[in-house]
Design a protein with these regions (language model features):
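Extracellular glycan-recognition surfaces and repeat-rich motifs
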Residues: 33-66, 73-74
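Short, aromatic/His-centered strand-loop micro-motif at the edge of beta-sheets
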Residues: 135-156
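Ligand-recognition surfaces built from glycine- and aromatic
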Residues: 183-211
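Short tryptophan-centered beta-strand motifs in secreted/extracellular beta-sheet-rich domains
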Residues: 28, 90-92, 153-168
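Short, solvent-exposed beta-strand-to-loop segments that form ligand-recognition rims
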Residues: 169-190
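Boundary at the C-terminal end of the N-terminal hydrophobic targeting segment
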Residues: 17-23
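Secretory/extracellular carbohydrate-interaction modules
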Residues: 33, 69-135
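Bacterial N-terminal signal peptides that target proteins for export
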Residues: 1-11
């Protein structure tokens, strides 16, 4: 009986170890204002002069700081290059502030470099959610879905990915669920904007598997 119990406990411990979720959250509140947060890398797919910096924001979900993109470029991005994630989730709070051409906020995953990655974004000017893959510096549309995205309001964007399966969730509602295999294997994670979007981000989080 004791031997059987020991086997059961050992099995349960092994299962728990295999399903343990590693998660990390970045609220930018310990980073200096006016500069890029420590451990992050910024750039642009295409052309332009993006400007990513930590800024104080009284409306931040976790006060006092946010990460803000206030420059412009084809597709500005800001990633954690030390992360290597193949399957899991990434989520962020974002607030589209201004932009004549676009008012977008998004997340990237399986980021290999500035020209190759997945991106999901929401756009306050278009009121939609979309999923893309970027390969060789060219953004390719996978799917668009209409969704309410009011400007100057904080939203929650989450993507879950495992193998080919991708789920995109905005403000607690799933808008996209589908299979796509254009980009596989581990990569970095981060945030993304488009064109002249001025967008704030807070509470960026990723984990090794979807919850």
């Amino acid at each position: 009986m004791k031997k059987a119990l020991a086997v059961i406990l050992s099995t349960l411990a092994s299962v728990a170890a295999m399903t343990t979720t590693h998660a990390e959250t970045f609220s930018f509140d310990r980073d200096a204002a006016g500069v890029l947060p420590a451990g992050w890398r910024a750039g642009v797919t295409g052309r332009g002069s993006p400007k990513w910096s930590v800024e104080q924001d009284a409306s931040a979900p976790s006060k006092p700081n946010v990460l803000r993109q206030s420059g412009s470029g084809t597709f500005p991005w800001c990633v954690r290059p030390d992360v290597s994630l193949a399957d899991g989730y990434v989520e962020v709070r974002f607030k589209p502030l201004t932009g004549r051409e676009d008012q977008a906020g998004g997340v990237v995953w399986r980021w290999k470099d500035g020209d190759d990655y997945y991106v999901a974004r929401a756009n306050a000017l278009e009121n939609n959610v979309s999923l893309y893959y970027t390969a060789g510096g060219r953004r390719n549309t996978i799917k668009y879905v209409d969704a309410p995205v009011p400007g100057n309001v904080w939203h929650a964007l989450r993507v879950e990915f495992a193998g080919k399966r991708i789920r995109v969730i905005l403000d607690g509602k799933q808008y996209i669920e589908m299979d796509d295999d254009h980009i596989s294997g581990p990569g970095a994670v981060g945030v993304w904007t488009k064109a002249d979007s001025v967008t704030s981000f807070d509470d960026f989080r990723y984990g090794i598997r979807a919850r």
